[in-house]
Amino acid sequence: GFIVIPRIVHTDTGICMTGGHAWDEVEEADGPWAIRKEIRKQVRDGAEWVKILTTNRESYPELTQEELDAAVDEAHRQGVKIAVHSGTQPSIQMCIDAGFDTIEHGTFLTEAQARQMAEKGIAWTPTITAYTYLYEQTKQMIEAGVDMDNPIAARAVHDQAFFQPAFEAYRDNFKKLYDTGVTVLAGSDMVLYKAPPLPIHQELGYMVDYGITPVEAVRTATYNAASV
């Protein structure tokens, strides 16, 4: 027999600069033409979407404006859509200027930028669940006592300095950003510290906790996602 399943849109591996965010898990490419080549290879192999990664947890953008512009241009030239992992400033603005189809995380997105995204048709996938998990996990590790000779514990101390303000940014700003009219998408992300699977309904629950209605939250995982 047959069963009905969700429509699955295929992406290939992400693309970052040499030594960039998740470099050991994605493809590295430097310069506009290397990025264009990697996108062409992925489209050749069946990718329907492309993902670029351009921030880690620092304030500097990893890819240049020229590289971001080239990535968007090539993906759209090839007839596919393109997402970008970007959480900090000024990278978020650079990605808006480049014209990506979605911004993943957008952790420190401003209201003015969200309005720009709404005007340009750029969607936002906040991934609240991932950052909440990472904040809570690193907080628990620190409260349990940190052995700085343990590299995982030492990393938790370093990461907590980012994950706490990230958690607070989502909690304090999500509803204001949603109200700008930017298209919001539900997403879970893959995270660190041996995280369990992060179900979409948990993401929708945080959205409701932070101020939108249950129907609006469900829409982020259904109609909004299908329309992008």
PLM regions and their residue ranges:
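Catalytic cores of alpha/beta
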Residues: Q89-D97
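Short hydrophobic/aromatic-enriched beta-strand-loop microsegments
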Residues: V4, F100-F108, W124-P126
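A cross-domain feature marking catalytic cores of carbohydrate-active enzymes
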Residues: D12-T13, I52-T54, V84-T88, H105-T107, ...
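Divalent metal-coordination and catalytic microenvironments
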Residues: I8, G46, V50, A75, ...
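His/Asp/Glu-enriched, well-ordered alpha-helical/loop segment
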Residues: R77, R155, A166-V228
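Glycine-enriched alpha-helix->loop->beta-strand junction motifs that scaffold or abut catalytic
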Residues: I96-T102, A118-W124, G181-V182
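Divalent-metal coordination cores built from histidine and acidic residues
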Residues: G1-K81, Q113-A153
